[in-house]
Amino acid sequence: MKNVDNYRRGYFMPPVKSLKWAEKEYITTPPTWCSVDLRDGNQALVVPMSLEEKLEYYHMLLKIGFKEIEVGFPAASETEYAFLRTLIEQNLIPEDVTIQVLTQSRDHIIEKTFKALVGVKKAVVHLYNSTSVAQREQVFKMSREEIVEIAVSGARLLKKYAAETEGNFQFEYSPESFTGTEMEFALEICNQVLDVFEPTPENKVIINLPATVSLSMPHVYASQIEYMSEHLKYRDNVILSLHPHNDRGTAVADAELGLLAGGQRIEGTLFGNGERTGNVDIVTLALNLFSHGVDPGLNFASMLEITAKYEALTRMKVHDRQPYGGKLVFAAFSGSHQDAITKGIKWREEHECHYWNVPYLLIDPQDIGREYEGDVIRINSQSGKGGIAYMLEQHYALDLPAKMREAFGYKVKNVSDNLHKELMPEEIKDIFFKEYVNIENPIKFLNFHFLNHDDFQTTVTLEFKGEIQELSGEGDGRLDAISNALQARLGLSYSNLIYKEHALELGSKSQAVSYVGVTGPDGVIHWGCGIHTDIFTSSVKALISAINTMIKDSAAV
């Protein structure tokens, strides 16, 4: 590409690296989760949420289980201020939930922030100022010392107004644009702020290290976090928080490695909504933990409901391939994938396996409110016999013989290919019935009669080419007798009769279904299916359907 020489790495490695985080295999305990949907997420919407919409979103966050929720920047707008006052005055903050508010390091802004907090029982007050080289040089045109003074003076003001306001206030500080800041300077400014706050075991301070713009690979961010974690003053009384953005598409990886490196808290949003490419997706982070057997402490058991409400309130779209939340994240169109999933699910049922280990499915879709039938097995021109048969069995209790599955699979794939679309279960059933079930052309079955139960001699009444005919025959069994009568009198030739039957339990419990395959002179197996309240009548209808299919297929050649 052109202009590649215009770019360089804009991050700063820590002066020392221990890389202890790299020795850890996985995250063993969940972080403290702080939703910033109502501030970081909301400000990034084309149409920000109204107060009523924010209230509905807030209640959804509570239902999911968030215990820390950033509710806004009350000094930034009247809507943000009014929303905070509504939560406080209507007593909408549960005892075990802490709200968080954002403020810049300016006296009148901090004063208005605490005015908005009057009456709250507890809250996190989040102070931030930009520290990166680019911000210092281009935006603020200030030295390091001047940037430190902004942070320190803001910290002093927080302490002052907190002392004058009733309530329990926890302080948070963010060196905004941390990833573009020299690590020694980021450490210096955080430690000077901590000296003002003087954290204690009873009143810990949150130091939040945002990847305001993601500038590096995740392992670099992890090394930066580890350096800060190992060198911050008052470390036992500091909660180290992470706030990754997704500019390089690595926010989840940044967060996960950052947690291994000493992070204890995550600020993020549902489905990664946020400025530019978004914040880290808490849904993905939480359910990644879940997939490793670690309880994330958040409840996404009703994922479809959460997704629908998110889309309605934010007017954003959850991508079909968005991890865990997208419509197609569990969908298998590929034949080999469908076959493996179907066999894996059946294996679990037969073995009563405790641990989830189904091929191609990271977690059990049912754990987040999804279904195997509609969400996992999907049918298009790439689908295989296993997935197609699975749909018929799950939706309509039709358990096709193995070889019939293959033949029917080709028919379904051809239809999907010609229509250029995915096929729904009802469409698949319609194809099956049209091709195989109770076929009456050119031979229409009318009746049969056996002389007695022990002697397999039969008379079959049918309509063939517009004429009513009675055919007689005998054989080793009742279906064999009817088959022999048909072959002898109608001049038909086939062999290797395949037969399977079972009760049709879904919909009509009194009905039975039979499947019959016959091998024609061309060596091809032709299939038919019969459905009737009498099990033997269903088998006769299946046989005649198979013969009709053979005649039709032969005529088409």
UniProtKB/Swiss-Prot annotation:
GO MF annotations, alphabetized: 2-isopropylmalate synthase activity; acetyl-CoA C-acetyltransferase activity; magnesium ion binding
GO biological process entries: L-leucine biosynthetic process
Binding-site residues, Mg(2+): 40, 243, 245, 279
Catalyzed reactions: 3-methyl-2-oxobutanoate + acetyl-CoA + H2O = (2S)-2-isopropylmalate + CoA + H(+)
Annotated SMART domains: LeuA_dimer (SM00917)
Domain Pyruvate carboxyltransferase: 31-304
SUPFAM superfamilies named among the record's database cross-references: 2-isopropylmalate synthase LeuA, allosteric (dimerisation) domain, Aldolase, post-HMGL domain-like
Cofactor(s) required, per the database record: Mg(2+)
UniProt region (Regulatory domain), positions on chain: 439-557
CDD domains for the chain: DRE_TIM_LeuA
EC number(s) recorded for this UniProt protein: 2.3.3.13
Any single GO CC term annotated in Swiss-Prot or TrEMBL for this entry: cytoplasm
Keyword annotations of the record: Amino-acid biosynthesis, Branched-chain amino acid biosynthesis, Cytoplasm, Leucine biosynthesis, Magnesium, Metal-binding, Transferase
Gene3D superfamilies: 3.30.160.270, Aldolase class I
Function as written in the Swiss-Prot or TrEMBL entry: Catalyzes the condensation of the acetyl group of acetyl-CoA with 3-methyl-2-oxobutanoate (2-ketoisovalerate) to form 3-carboxy-3-hydroxy-4-methylpentanoate (2-isopropylmalate).
Subunit description: Homodimer.
Family: Belongs to the alpha-IPM synthase/homocitrate synthase family. LeuA type 2 subfamily.
Record's protein name: 2-isopropylmalate synthase
